[in-house]
């Protein structure tokens, strides 16, 4: 049996139950474990509600309980430069970004990984619901977590082979309910702590209010695709493709009483397009173009791939054909898809394996670009 005590694992601890159990399991398996709390956002800012101080106290309590050293590291500058600025620039461009994908790529598995190496780490570990498997050639494959409802490979799709080689996901084979049970059995301070939701730097704040502190909103016209004026919108950045609600038009102006949805945007004219019906024809597309295409292992610069894909988190896989050219790809759907949203991640799968992904730039319907930006 191998001696794990000679293998140092640095665990990213958030003060939540998942990362607490991650540290506990590794400690029980005999690894040399160090806990590190990442402070990524200045919660003294009047708009940040990340409760970093409380979270750090929870990390300290759990680390003391399981008997591991712990540190706090400040990544506020890196987070602002690499994640938050990206988040703002995407909204400014009329897109709907996914900051979690960028945070994993740039902070948790880059800045944190680099820091862990200065502590003499052999590996880093996080509480993500995903699995890593090493094949006989030493290549690491990233697989979905066994808890379908919690699988987080969508958010980890930009990780590189180099990053995966140094990563452990001890919760990947567990259900969330089992993780809670382990925490309760061990009497961990975080056993009953509520899971955090939403974007870290917004916390419980009103999203519109938060965004308007950084980007001035430009009101404009809300129109149907056939040119009827439906009133005023509050600013294009507040709306996402396929969104229902928050439009202020209810069932009015329509003969069929179907709900209204955001079906398009025109950034150059500052127009928000709305239409009735969940499957409104303007919401349906047959292909997309993506950039920042990235695979979790080395691939040729040009190739074609038949696989499945997700276009948003918690969505069933759809069959696609991917035509890759360097960092760009065209993704053609077997069946038309609804509300393909520029700025969101498209993530590729081969059965249980997450192959990688990219960021959606444009959607097309039978070769014609959808008016989504």
From Swiss-Prot:
The gene is mnmA. Residues 150-152, 312-313 are annotated as: Interaction with tRNA. Transmembrane segments: none annotated. The active site is at residues 103, 200. The record marks 128, 344 as: Interaction with tRNA. The keyword Transferase applies. Residues 98-100 are annotated as: Interaction with target base in tRNA. Keywords: ATP-binding, Cytoplasm, Disulfide bond, Nucleotide-binding, RNA-binding, Transferase, tRNA processing, tRNA-binding. Belongs to the MnmA/TRMU family. CDD domains: MnmA_TRMU-like. ATP binds at residues 12-19, 38, 127. The keyword NAD does not apply. It comes from Streptococcus uberis (strain ATCC BAA-854 / 0140J). Disulfide bonds join 103-200. GO terms for cellular component: cytoplasm. Its main location: cytoplasm. Pfam families: tRNA_Me_trans (PF03054), tRNA_Me_trans_C (PF20258), tRNA_Me_trans_M (PF20259). This is tRNA-specific 2-thiouridylase MnmA.
